Amino acid sequence: MERIICPSLMCANYDSLKDEIMKLDSAGIDIFHIDIMDGTFVPNFGMGIQDVQAIRRNTNKMVDSHLMISNPGEYVDLFADLGVDLIYIHPETDMHPVRTLGKIKARNILSGIAINPGTSIESIIELLPIVDYVMVMTVNPGFAGQKYLNFVNDKIERLVKLKLEYKFKIMVDGAISEEKINKLSDLGVDGFILGTSALFGKEEEYKDIVKRLKTIKEEAN
């Protein structure tokens, strides 16, 4: 099964964002990942509405929005109108996550939940039947360049067992290196949000990196 490769555009070169999008698109990435932050749920600010518009305008690939914001349900229609294909919410930021996920589905958009390192599986298990994607944060959300939190692997292993019943895809986000991609693929992870650890700021061209990341497991075996 081919891995889902998702560049985190927060790590891209903003001086030439359009060129970055076009190169990543032609390199064969699967989903463009956009981090939206409000400075409240996480102590940082991410990409804005104009960034989402520019990305959507320059690619036909899937685009997701990771809403690291308070009350995400209030913004579902806004991001749906911008043309995103997948919306992730953090359930702990929403008084009514079931309603918000239903609102996402009603707009014919894929629904996802993002799980912080400190969020328990028990607290989100009732949402699993109604989501398409579960994104596990392997760092604390809000900043690039953090170290991978190994204790999260236990949570990933539990989700791999649960997805056999509920049929969602498992994504991981945070300090994802090539080595981690190989190991996490073996655990049963479907896709990877990639930043500076594996994709951006390298001397290689994106097309060469993406090709290798999609095939690294087969080469290792």
Language model regions located:
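Conserved anion-binding
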Residues: 16, 74-75, 85-169
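N-terminal active-site wall of soluble small-molecule enzyme domains
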Residues: 36-103
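Hydrophobic faces of well-ordered beta-strands that scaffold small-molecule active sites
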Residues: 4-8, 32-34, 63-67, 87-89, ...
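Alpha-helix-loop-beta-strand connector modules within alpha/beta enzyme cores
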Residues: 45-65, 103-112, 152-170, 212-221
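Glycine-rich beta-to-alpha transition loops that act as phosphate-gripper elements at the mouths
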Residues: 8-11, 46, 65-72, 93, ...
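Conserved, mostly hydrophobic/aromatic
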Residues: 17, 24, 35, 79, ...
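Glycine-rich phosphate-binding active-site loops on the catalytic face of alpha/beta enzymes
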Residues: 89-95, 135-145, 187-209
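Catalytic cores of alpha/beta
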Residues: 73-81, 119-129, 176-192
